[in-house]
């Protein structure tokens, strides 16, 4: 993986940080107003919520490199070489199409359907869109998905023009994340309902 570039929206850190602060405040407040059982229940629920937000907002990212792309979602990490990608686009989020299957990137969410009304023609220069007169809202350069799609198309075009060899495709399941999530759910249910 040479010349790698990672894309993750900065707003993800803001949302996750806000949840962490809220959970810390709830835990602090419970020490003053709850019994030991209430404090433990609050800690369990706050840890579960904070970890779910960590998986949903902080972990997802898209990594572009000369040979391919890696899409990291909460419980899966998919690496695909540029030569295997049939299409790059954005519907609900940025996606790549490989072998007829669409792989969506959680890190590059598309905006609402009315966003395309606010796009000006000057924003589309140099993006090499297939049909610049009929742009999807998710391909706007002012959106998370639009930035990721533009970066992916630039990297794929460079790959094709240089006749490089793509990387091998791989899929990795986030066992550690899934195990931690399952343990937190079990402990939270045990503390809450026992």
Give each language-model segment a name:
Residues 1-34, 142, 149-194:
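N-terminal membrane-targeting/pre-transmembrane regions
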Residues 35-42:
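Short, aromatic-rich membrane-interface segments at the entry and exit
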């Amino acid at each position: 993986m040479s010349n790698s570039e990672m894309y993750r929206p900065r707003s993800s850190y803001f949302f996750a940080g806000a949840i962490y602060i809220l959970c810390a405040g709830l835990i602090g407040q419970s020490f003053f107003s709850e019994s030991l059982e209430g404090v433990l229940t609050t800690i369990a629920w706050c840890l579960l919520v904070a970890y779910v937000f960590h998986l949903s907002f902080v972990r997802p990212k898209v990594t572009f490199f000369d040979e391919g792309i890696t899409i990291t979602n909460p419980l899966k990490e998919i690496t695909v070489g540029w030569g295997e990608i049939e299409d790059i686009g954005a519907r609900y989020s940025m996606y790549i199409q490989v072998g007829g299957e669409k792989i969506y990137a959680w890190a590059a969410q598309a905006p609402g359907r009315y966003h395309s009304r606010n796009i000006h023609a000057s924003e589309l220069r140099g993006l090499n869109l297939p049909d610049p007169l009929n742009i999807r809202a998710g391909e706007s350069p002012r959106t998370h998905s639009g930035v990721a799609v533009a970066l992916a198309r630039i990297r794929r075009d460079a790959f094709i023009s240089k006749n490089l060899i793509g990387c091998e495709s791989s899929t990795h399941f986030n066992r550690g994340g899934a195990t931690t999530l399952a343990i937190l759910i079990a402990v939270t249910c045990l503390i809450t309902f026992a």
